[in-house]
Amino acid sequence: MESKMRKIGRISILIALFALFFACGEKGVTGKMKSAGKTENHEKIDPFLEANKIIVRREAEEIELFIKRYQWTMKETGSGLRIEILDVGEGDFFKEGDEVTLNFQLFLLDGEVVYDSKNDGKKVFVVDKSSEITGLHEAVKLLKPGGKANLVIPSHLAYGVAGDGHRIIGQKSVAMKISIEK
């Protein structure tokens, strides 16, 4: 499964490089200045759009396959976060500025556990005020103290194009099991 994921990643990179190569090609220097606010040549943008559409479609397919494999019953938010609330918790919902402590397990969509609170310690962060991934902030605001949930976080809400610089490469969706302390 790991080699399949790497192959998909390599294909995505090749598509992006192909699009970049053709998007940057110029037929000749005209000496004319172009306005930064106007798009005069739509042909230069189309390869980027097409490459991005392919990448987004493949990522969505991977997410759906993962959800089916684990038989999670998920709801999708407007941003693309998928969440299965196992226990909403008690008290007030978390909001911006609240401190959260949670146990977690973070893994790739091939099932490989990347980080977990048993080995890496609990996550302690302030909602919407820390460098935790955007998808986790969004999910926590749907829960209360003591809440538990399964999450599938698309790459744009996780570690983005660059990855985390350690164990997660760029453009990878991640899944999390979280349990918030009371």
Protein language model features and the residues they cover:
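Cross-family detector of peptidyl-prolyl cis-trans isomerase
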Residues: E2, R6-G9, C24-K182
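Sec-dependent signal peptide hydrophobic core
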Residues: G9-A16
